[in-house]
Design a protein with these regions (language model features):
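Alpha-helix capping and helix-loop boundary segments enriched in small/acidic/polar residues
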Residues: 3, 186-193, 275-286, 318-326, ...
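Conserved phosphate-handling catalytic cores of large alpha/beta enzymes
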Residues: 355-366, 374-410, 414-420, 428
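Subset of Sec-pathway N-terminal targeting signals
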Residues: 1-34
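Cofactor-binding active-site loop characterized by glycine-rich and histidine/acidic residues
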Residues: 212-377, 381, 591-643
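Active-site pocket-lining segments that scaffold enzyme catalytic pockets across diverse folds
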Residues: 172, 176-236, 544-547, 551, ...
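Extended, charge-enriched "interface" segments that sit outside catalytic cores
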Residues: 34-194, 211
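Flexible, glycine-rich loop/tail regions that form catalytic "lids" or insertion modules at the edges
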Residues: 47-57, 61-99, 116, 171, ...
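A structural-propensity feature for long, helix-poor, extended segments
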Residues: 86-117, 122, 256, 358-363, ...
Length: 767
C-alpha cells in the first residue's frame, strides 16, 4: 500500500471510531474485523476477520468469472484465485467461526460454512455481475436477492413438471421440423431451447404483476419456436407456411420469409390477459431494437398514461450481434433519456458462442458479449443454458429488477447451436472441435430430466417419454390436417388502433384531402406563438423574433416557413392529435428558425407555446435527441407504428445525415407495408440544398429515396412555399390511411423574403 492509501485508511478508521455509520457498510465490516481480530505477535497484526470479508467481497466481484455457465466446454481461465491462502487464511481456520459470515447471513459461521455458501451462490450455474453498479441501493437489493432468494431456491414438483413440459415442447418442435422439412431454413433454437423457458416464465410473472403488454424484438434464430410456444401461433399455420400453401394472388404485397414475420395475441394466464407482440424485422441484426423501444414508449405514453410498469420490452440478441452491431450501443444509450426511456429493457442473449462461422475471440475484444451493460450500470446474469431452473430464477430476477428500478437488465444464456448457421450449413468446416463436443451433447431437456429424476423420487421415470410421444403425436396430427386440407390465407388482424384506417389505392393520390383551417384558428395559434407568461424573460434575440412573428400573424398576414410549420402543429393539437418531434437540435432547429421552446434568460426554464393553446388540446412533445441517426429514426418509426393518430416527426440535422439511418429507411420505412402489411405515417424532414456547405451537408440524396419508391409505398417531396408545407404536415393525419413521407426541407429559404404565404393559402387551399 502507498502512503496515500494508509493515510486514507487512517482517516476512514478515525471516522469509524467516532461514528461507525459514517462509513460504507463494507468498511464497517472491515474495521469490525480489524478491532475483533487484531493481536500483537512478533510485532505483526493478524486480520482474520477482514480477510474473510475480503474473501466474501472477492466472490461477489469475481465469482462470475469462475461460475459453471458453459454447458459444452471448459471456460476460459481468467486468473481468478479463491484459495483461502491468498487471503491470509489456512486450513486451520476452516473450523474457526467468523462474525464476517453475517455479511452473507451466517452469524458466527465457520470458514468452511462460509465457503460452502459462497461456492453455491457464486460458482454455480449463474454468474452474477453487479458489484460494479454505482447505486448502493441497487447493489444491496441485488446482493440480498442473490444471497437469499437464489441461495434458498426451492422449486416445487409442479413447477418442475411445468418447466419440463414447456422445454419438451420446444425440443420436440425443433426435432419435428428438422425431420419433416430436411434442409429447409428455419434457424432452429436447438441447443438454446431454454430461451422458451425464460420467455414463458417472464410472461407468467408479468401476468401476476399486472403487466398489460410485452413487446418482443428478436432476430431469426428460434423465432418459429417463440411464435408457437409463447405467442400461440398455431402449429397448423407454421406447417402451412412450410408446405408453401399460399396463393400469391390473395396475399397483399410481397410478403417475407416466415422467420421475419411478426405476430400478436392475447394470452390468458390465471384469468389475467396479457397482450404479447413480436415486432417483424429484417435480416439486419439488432435493427429492430430501437423500433421495439419506440413502440413501447408510444404505448406507455398513450395507452398506459406514463406507467412504465404496464408495458415491458424484451430484446433477444445473438452474442456476436450484441457485441458487434453499433445500433445496440445507440439504443442502450437511450435508457435514461427523457425522450426515449421505456422504464427498462429486458435484454436476453442467445449466446451460441459463435457468429455464423466466427469464433467469439474474433467477434469481440471484451470478456463478455454483454459488457456494454456497464455503460448504464445494468446487472448481468450469465446463465447455463442446460439449467432451466437457473433460467427460471434469472427470469424472476429480470422482471423484479426491471419493475423496481425501471432499468435495463441483461440475461446472457450460455448455450450452443446444434447445427450450422442454418440447417443446410456445415459448421465443422471451421469449428470441428466444438461441433464434435456438441454432436455428443444431450439436449437441454434430456439434461434436465436426468437431473430431476435423480433428485426427485416423485418424478416418474417414464414422464419424459410420455411427454415426448404425446406432443410429437399432436404435431403429426396438425401436419396431416394441413397436408389434407391446406389452410386458406388469413391476414393477421390489425392492431386495434389501426382498425379505423384502410389501405390506400392509386386514386387517393390524384387529389389531397381537406387540410385547410379558418382564420379564427390561425389567430388563436398565432397569439400563443407570440406571447410568453408574465415574468418570463427571454433573451433579446427571442424578443425580436416574437415581435417579427406577431407582425407576420397580425399585421402582414404573411407567414414564413417556421410560422407555417408551427401553425400546422398547433392546428393538429387543437384537433386533438398528439405530436412528437425528435432529432438533433430540433427544439431550436439547426438553422435557428423553429424555436418550439423558449428559454428564460435568467433561469433557463423552458416555455412551450404549443402546449399553451387550449385546455382541451392534445400533447406536444419535442426532444433534442442523442447524437444518433440509426437509433433515433428507428425509435420514431416504432413510435409511429404504435400511434397512427399521432404525428411523429424525425428531423435530420442535415439531410445527408439520413444515410446514417439507411437500414431503417430501406428495411422498414420503405418496405414494411409490402413485406409485413404495416402502414406508418412517419414524417422525415431532411434539410437539403447547396448553400455554402461544400460537398457535405448539401444533398439529402433524393435519388436514393426516389429509387425506393414503388407502388405508392411512400411520399418524397420538395416544397417551395410555407403553405404547401403546412398542408403536407396536416395531410399526414388527414388521409384515411398512413404513408411515410420524406420532405427535402429548405435552408436559406427559411428566411428568404419571397418564401411566404398569405392567409388565403391556409384557409382556402390544400396540398
Amino acid at each position: 500500500m502507498s502512503g496515500s492509501d494508509i493515510n486514507y485508511m487512517d482517516d476512514l478508521y478515525s471516522k469509524y471510531k467516532s461514528d461507525p455509520h459514517s462509513v460504507d457498510i463494507s468498511w464497517q465490516k472491515f474495521f469490525e474485523g480489524f478491532d475483533y481480530s487484531i493481536t500483537n505477535s512478533l510485532g505483526s497484526v493478524k486480520f482474520t476477520e477482514s480477510s474473510v470479508s475480503q474473501l466474501i467481497e472477492a466472490y461477489r466481484r469475481y465469482g462470475h468469472l469462475k461460475s459453471l455457465t458453459n454447458p459444452v466446454r471448459t471456460r476460459r481461465d481468467h486468473n481468478v484465485d479463491f484459495s483461502i491462502e491468498k487471503f491470509g487464511l489456512s486450513d486451520s481456520d476452516l473450523s474457526q467461526t467468523f462474525s464476517a459470515g453475517s455479511e452473507i447471513g451466517i452469524d458466527n459461521g465457520t470458514l468452511k460454512e462460509i465457503l460452502e455458501k459462497l461456492n453455491k451462490i457464486y460458482l454455480g450455474p449463474i454468474g452474477f455481475e453487479y458489484v460494479n453498479i454505482r447505486n448502493t441501493e441497487e447493489v444491496n437489493w441485488i446482493k440480498e436477492w442473490v444471497e437469499n432468494k437464489w441461495y434458498s431456491q426451492n422449486i416445487g414438483i409442479d413447477k418442475k413438471k411445468s418447466i419440463l413440459t414447456k422445454l419438451n415442447e420446444a425440443v420436440v418442435f425443433e426435432n419435428f421440423l428438422h425431420t419433416k422439412y430436411i434442409g429447409q431454413k428455419r434457424f432452429s433454437l436447438e441447443g438454446g431451447e431454454n430461451t422458451i423457458t425464460f420467455l414463458n416464465e417472464i410472461v407468467n410473472s408479468a401476468c401476476d404483476n399486472d403487466v398489460k403488454e410485452v413487446v418482443i424484438g428478436m432476430a431469426h434464430r428460434g423465432r418459429l419456436n417463440v411464435l408457437t410456444s409463447i405467442l400461440k401461433k398455431t402449429y397448423d399455420e407454421v406447417f402451412n407456411e412450410f408446405e408453401g400453401n399460399m396463393d400469391p394472388d390473395k396475399i397483399f404485397g410481397d410478403g417475407d420469409v416466415k422467420y421475419h414475420l411478426g405476430y400478436n395475441s392475447y394470452i390468458n394466464r390465471d384469468k389475467n390477459n396479457i397482450y404479447i407482440k413480436l415486432i417483424p424485422n429484417p435480416s439486419h441484426l439488432e435493427s429492430v431494437n430501437p423500433v421495439v423501444m419506440g413502440y413501447v414508449r408510444a404505448q406507455i405514453d398513450e395507452e398506459y398514461r406514463g406507467n412504465f410498469n404496464s408495458a415491458i420490452p424484451i430484446l433477444i440478441h445473438g452474442d456476436a450481434a450484441i457485441a458487434g452491431q453499433g445500433i445496440v450501443y445507440e439504443t442502450v444509450q437511450m435508457a435514461k433519456l427523457k425522450g426515449y426511456q421505456v422504464g427498462g429493457v429486458i435484454h436476453f442473449v442467445i449466446n451460441n458462442q459463435i457468429g455464423f462461422t466466427t469464433d467469439y475471440d474474433d467477434a469481440r475484444s471484451s470478456i463478455y458479449c454483454t459488457d456494454l451493460a456497464k455503460i448504464i450500470d445494468s446487472p448481468v446474469l450469465h446463465v447455463n443454458g442446460d439449467d432451466p431452473e437457473a433460467v427460471y430464477y434469472a427470469s424472476q430476477f429480470a422482471l423484479e429488477y426491471r419493475q423496481k428500478f425501471k432499468k435495463d437488465v441483461f440475461i446472457d444464456l450460455l448455450c450452443y447451436r446444434r447445427h450450422g448457421h442454418n440447417e443446410s450449413d456445415e459448421p465443422k468446416f471451421t469449428q470441428p472441435n466444438l461441433y464434435n463436443l456438441i454432436s455428443k451433447h444431450p439436449s437441454p431437456r434430456d439434461v434436465y430430466f436426468k437431473k430431476i429424476i435423480e433428485k426427485d423420487s416423485e418424478i416418474d421415470k417414464g414422464l419424459a417419454d410420455k411427454l415426448n410421444k404425446e406432443f410429437k403425436s399432436l404435431l403429426q396430427e396438425r401436419l396431416n390436417e394441413v397436408k389434407q386440407k391446406p389452410l386458406p390465407y388469413k391476414p393477421q388482424k390489425k392492431d386495434e388502433e389501426w382498425n379505423f384506417l384502410r389501405n390506400s389505392t392509386s386514386k387517393d393520390f390524384i387529389s389531397s384531402p381537406k387540410t385547410s383551417i379558418n382564420e379564427k384558428t390561425i389567430n388563436k395559434i398565432g397569439k400563443s406563438l407570440t406571447t410568453v407568461p408574465k415574468g418570463f424573460k427571454p433573451i433579446k434575440q427571442i424578443i425580436r423574433l416574437l415581435k417579427d412573428r406577431e407582425s407576420n400573424f397580425f399585421d402582414k398576414k404573411l407567414l414564413n416557413w417556421a410560422d407555417a410549420e408551427l401553425l400546422a402543429y398547433g392546428s393538429l393539437l387543437l384537433d386533438n392529435k398528439n405530436i412528437r418531434i425528435s432529432g438533433q437540435d430540433v427544439i431550436r432547429g439547426t438553422f435557428s428558425h423553429r424555436h418550439a421552446k423558449l428559454f428564460d434568460a435568467s433561469t433557463n426554464q423552458p416555455y412551450s407555446p404549443l402546449n399553451n393553446l387550449s385546455k382541451e388540446q392534445a400533447n406536444f412533445n419535442i426532444y433534442n435527441s442523442l447524437l444518433s441517426e440509426f437509433g433515433v429514426l428507428g425509435f420514431e418509426y416504432g413510435y409511429s407504428m404504435a400511434s397512427p393518430n399521432t404525428l411523429v416527426v424525425w428531423e435530420a440535422q442535415f439531410g445527408d445525415f439520413s444515410n446514417g439511418a439507411q437500414v431503417i429507411i430501406d428495411q422498414f420505412i420503405s418496405s414494411a407495408e409490402t413485406k409485413w402489411e404495416k402502414m406508418n405515417g412517419l414524417l422525415v424532414l431532411l434539410p437539403h440544398g447547396y448553400e455554402g456547405q461544400g460537398p457535405e451537408h448539401s444533398s439529402a440524396r433524393p435519388q436514393r429515396l426516389l429509387s425506393l419508391c414503388s407502388e405508392d409505398n411512400m411520399v418524397v417531396a420538395n416544397l417551395t412555399t410555407p403553405a404547401n408545407f403546412f398542408h403536407l404536415i396536416r395531410r399526414q393525419l388527414a388521409w384515411e390511411f398512413r404513408k411515410p413521407c420524406f420532405l427535402l426541407s429548405p435552408k436559406s429559404l427559411l428566411r428568404h423574403p419571397s418564401v411566404i404565404s398569405n392567409f388565403d393559402d391556409f384557409t382556402n387551399s390544400q396540398f
